[in-house]
Amino acid sequence: MDQSNRYANLNLKESDLIAGGRHVLCAYIMKPKAGFGNFVETAAHFAAESSTGTNVEVSTTDDFTRGVDALVYEVDEAKELMKIAYPIELFDRNVIDGRAMIASFLTLTIGNNQGMGDVEYAKMHDFYVPPAYLRLFDGPSTTIKDLWRVLGRPVVDGGFIVGTIIKPKLGLRPQPFADACYDFWLGGDFIKNDEPQGNQVFAPFKDTVRAVNDAMRRAQDATGQPKLFSFNITADDHYEMLARGEYILETFGENADHVAFLVDGYVAGPAAVTTARRAFPKQYLHYHRAGHGAVTSPQSKRGYTAFVLSKMARLQGASGIHVGTMGYGKMEGEASDRDSAFMITQDSAEGPYFKQEWLGMNPTTPIISGGMNALRMPGFFANLGHSNLIMTAGGGAFGHIDGGAAGARSLRQAEQCWKQGADPVAFAKDHREFARAFESFPNDADKLYPNWRNMLKLAAA
C-alpha cells in the first residue's frame, strides 16, 4: 500500500522543523528492496512502521493520531538518503519522573523498521534532538574534570590520562591481576577492567576488589600521585549492579572518588547505563561499547553508526565512551571517528547531517583503545588536535620491552613529543622509555618511522 500521501511531505523545510522544536530528526541511508515500491513509497512505509502506522489503514486512526505521524521530509535517491521527522510526543517517558529514555528512541527510530520486507537496508547516520526533548535526558553527572581534579591537575586542558587494560583479558587470579595494576601505576594513571572481567570462578569479584584497593594504596604511597581504576559492574540484574558498585565504594572508602564504574553499554543496553548513572551519580560512568560493531561497522548496512552510538551515550549520561582510534589502532575505524569525539565534547557541534546544540549538557570524554602504543600516539594527537582524553593501551603498555611502568611512561612521553611538535625519532634520543618503544614495537616503527634504526643506532629487533 502506498502511504506516501500520509507519511511523506517533501514540502517541509528542515529549518522550519528545527525552529519549531517539536521533532526529532533522523537521517538514514536506505535502499528499497527490488520488486516493491519506489524510494518515496518505501520511505513512507518506513516512517509509518516507525510511528503511527502499519501496512494497512486501520479503523481506529483518528485526527489526533494523524497529528503525530512521523513524516519523510527529504529524500535523495541517488545518495540513498532519507530524512524523517518524529514528533517528540511519540517517545515514551518515565512514569516516575517524566524523563526521556533511549530505549524508546531506539524502539521507534531503529526498531521494527530494521526488519521490513520492502527495505533492502536502512542505517541511521545522524539524528537531531530539539531542546524540549534534550532537556529530558540525564546527560553525564561527572566528566573528565572530576578525574583531573582527583589527579591534582588543572580542570581546564588537564591533558592526557594514561591508562591501560590489564592483559590477558581473562585468566589472571586476583593477586597477579593486582600486581600488574601496581606495576602499571608506577608510571601511569588509570586502569580499567577489560569488558569480560567480573566475577569469574578463578577470580572472585570481592577478592579482586580488595587486592586492587591494596595495590592502589601501595602505588600511591610509592609515587606520591593519585591513581584511578574503572571497575566493571555490568550485569543482567539491576540489583547485581548495585551490589557490585556498593561493595567497591565500601572497600575503597576515602578513595571512592578514585573509582569509575564501567558498563558494557551496548550488550547490557540502556537500562544498565541508566542504572549506573542514577544509582551512582558521583562516579565516573565509563561506557564500554563491546559488540557494537555488529551494527555500527561500515560493513553493516543496517542499524546505526558509531557516531550515533556516541551521541546516544552522551544523552544517557556516559561520562566517557570508547570512540575508536581513528584508524591508528587495531580495531576497525576511520579518521572520521574524530567527528564522534568532537560531537560528544562540544556544546555545539556539526554532525554528518545535523548541527546539535547541547544546551550546557556535560560533555562525554573520548576514550581511546585498541592496538595503540607510544609510536602511534603523536599522529593520533595531531589528527584529533588535542590530548584531553583517556587512552587505555593494553599491549601498548605491557608489550613494552621494559614492562608496564615503562610502557606507561612511554605513552606519557608520546604526548610530550606531540605537544612540543618534535620529530618522534629525535625526541626518542633523550627519552629512554619512548626510545625503547621503537624496539618494543618494531613493525610499527618500521612503518611509521622508516629510518629509526639508523637514527637511534639500534639493531634490528
From Swiss-Prot:
Q: Which reaction does it catalyse?
A: 2 (2R)-3-phosphoglycerate + 2 H(+) = D-ribulose 1,5-bisphosphate + CO2 + H2O; D-ribulose 1,5-bisphosphate + O2 = 2-phosphoglycolate + (2R)-3-phosphoglycerate + 2 H(+)
In the record, what terms sit under GO molecular function?
magnesium ion binding; monooxygenase activity; ribulose-bisphosphate carboxylase activity
Q: What does this protein's record comment on cofactor binding?
A: Binds 1 Mg(2+) ion per subunit.
- Where are the N6-carboxylysine modifications? 192
Q: Which GO terms describe its biological process?
A: reductive pentose-phosphate cycle
Locate the site labelled Transition state stabilizer. 330
Short name of one Pfam family: RuBisCO_large
Give the EC class as a word.
lyase
Q: Which UniProt keywords apply?
A: Calvin cycle, Carbon dioxide fixation, Lyase, Magnesium, Metal-binding, Monooxygenase, Oxidoreductase, Photosynthesis
Protein residues bound to substrate: 112, 169, 289, 322, 369
Binding positions (Mg(2+)): 192, 194-195
| Active site: residue positions | 167, 288
* Known EC number: 4.1.1.39
For activity, the cofactor(s) needed are: Mg(2+)
Subunit info here reads: Homodimer.
Q: Which family does it belong to?
A: Belongs to the RuBisCO large chain family. Type II subfamily.
The record's listing under NCBIfam families reads: PRK13475.1
Q: What else is known?
A: The basic functional RuBisCO is composed of a large chain homodimer in a 'head-to-tail' conformation. In contrast to form I RuBisCO, the form II RuBisCO are composed solely of large subunits.
Q: What HAMAP family does the annotation carry?
A: RuBisCO_L_type2
Describe the task this protein carries out. RuBisCO catalyzes two reactions: the carboxylation of D-ribulose 1,5-bisphosphate, the primary event in carbon dioxide fixation, as well as the oxidative fragmentation of the pentose substrate. Both reactions occur simultaneously and in competition at the same active site.
Name of the protein described by the UniProt record: Ribulose bisphosphate carboxylase
The record lists the organism as Rhodopseudomonas palustris (strain BisB5)
